Amino acid sequence: MEESQAELGVEPPLSQETFSDLWKLLPENNLLSSELSPAVDDLLLSPEDVANWLDERPDEAPQMPEPPAPAAPTPAAPAPATSWPLSSFVPSQKTYPGSYGFHLGFLHSGTAKSVTCTYSPALNKLFCQLAKTCPVQLWVSSPPPPGTRVRAMAIYKKSEYMTEVVRRCPHHERCSDYSDGLAPPQHLIRVEGNLRAEYLDDRNTFRHSVVVPYEPPEVGSDCTTIHYNFMCNSSCMGGMNRRPILTIITLEDSNGNLLGRNSFEVRVCACPGRDRRTEEENFHKKGQSCPELPTGSAKRALPTGTSSSPPQKKKPLDGEYFTLQIRGRERFEMFRELNEALELKDAQAGKEPGESRAHSSHLKSKKGQSPSRHKKLMFKREGPDSD
């Protein structure tokens, strides 16, 4: 191969040259500066020095100086585990009309499957779909002062969850389908069609609320209507997780002082009409009275007189005698012997009279007759010509 390349006058590639050929290609002038040359020469060892050192210590392998160990990095503080924020403050849910007669109202709607929002007066509960309009009417007996605001806040209804802040599930927080650019993604309650709405996160209680200025009713109207949206289903895992919630509506002045308070339960579901009809039927079956608006406790008390056990039937009176007319001597003798045998059996066993009558009626039912049960029979002897 080399001869063929030499004949053709082709030089081998650079990688095929010897080290001496490559060393000759280096420039003769010293690349190191004059200042660094002495120091570098002191560090270099000649081949004779290396051979002498190995002869003196053949058992010892050359050891390279260990580089200094890098300083151990300061361990970073562990990130706090993500958990639901807890609040030490539980807002009151007691109805307070105040001096302005503040109370809420809702539009009348049925339980059809097509409804997106319906209110049950018997349950004081609003059933609605996700992100659908929920009109809430604000009624006052006299106009509140200027600068009055309306605040809406959600809390859990059951006492074991009241300290937990109500917020949306992680899935709906990341979902951008219902984002309006105004409300924070973790807020459950939004106000529809009001650019003056303020979404607040309390630094002390960590609770979410939405505040809008109170507007007096329009001409020809007796109430003010605010359209709310609930942005997460009640069944969402990681959010409400099937835990009932209450929405508290408060009327406040410009300084935050309370002027009135009212509340109602909310269920966000796929079919509000069906769920309302089902819960109302269960409510009436249990015989519960209409619940008052939530006070100190959100649970309804069951009536003490309600009992699930069926009423017991009255037992027939003991010691009654009945006359049974039987046609035919042969049949009469058969029933008479049967009755005497039962009486004798009861006398020998020492049973109670009620038990003997029950056993006697059971035997008579097997014979195809239908006399009154639990009755003692008394027969009247008749002649062969009687009917």
Curated annotation (Swiss-Prot):
According to its UniProt entry, this protein's organism is: Delphinapterus leucas
What is the name of the protein in this document?
Cellular tumor antigen p53
Q: Where is this region: Disordered?
A: 57-82, 277-319, 344-387
Crosslinked residue numbers (Glycyl lysine isopeptide (Lys-Gly) (interchain with G-Cter in ubiquitin)) = 24, 285-286, 345, 351
Which residue ranges does the UniProt annotation give for the motif Bipartite nuclear localization signal? 299-315
- According to the record, the residues making up region (Interaction with HIPK1) are 93-364
Q: Residues bearing Phosphoserine?
A: 15, 20, 33, 37, 46, 176, 263, 309, 386
Renumbered to this chain, region (Transcription activation (acidic)) spans: 1-45
Residue segments, region Required for interaction with ZNF385A: 93-294
Please list where the region (Interaction with WWOX) is annotated.
59-103
